Amino acid sequence: MKKIITLLLALVLPLCAPIYALAATPDESDFLSRYAQEPYVVTDCQMQVVVSEYNVLAVTETYQVYFNEARHGIYRYLPLRNQLTRTDGSTAVVTARVSHVDTGADECSHEVSNDKYVLRLGSEDETITGPHTYTIRYNYDLGLDTVKNADELY
């Protein structure tokens, strides 16, 4: 049975690798001046995760980004090797797989580097200034549960 889980960014630490930007509150009156020295800021981030019975997470991430200067886009790093410690003290290393990546109209290239799946969103030929919305959809496969009589999600 599938469950729809809407998770806050802070609760999904393995999926919330930094995208090299500062988080900011867009409704602050001095928002632009406060972060004007940064190349860009993430003004909002939302994630929706659908968990299948086979431990595959169908993830949709939406980022509102404000570019203070001309940039080609952003990077998104997804961890492929996850070390975890369970409540009983046992440890495990889980290797995840990323598939079915869709970034809509935004150009995207990817590579695997240092146990991370690296997404480069944006165009080498064009730059962006001002607000831009990125939506990234992908499957994050954690493999089958290895703990008997329990489901494991981290």
Locate predicted features.
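Bacterial N-terminal signal peptides that target proteins for export
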Residues: 1-8
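Bacterial N-terminal signal peptides
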Residues: 8-18
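Lumenal/extracellular ectodomains and adaptor appendage modules
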Residues: 18, 22-154
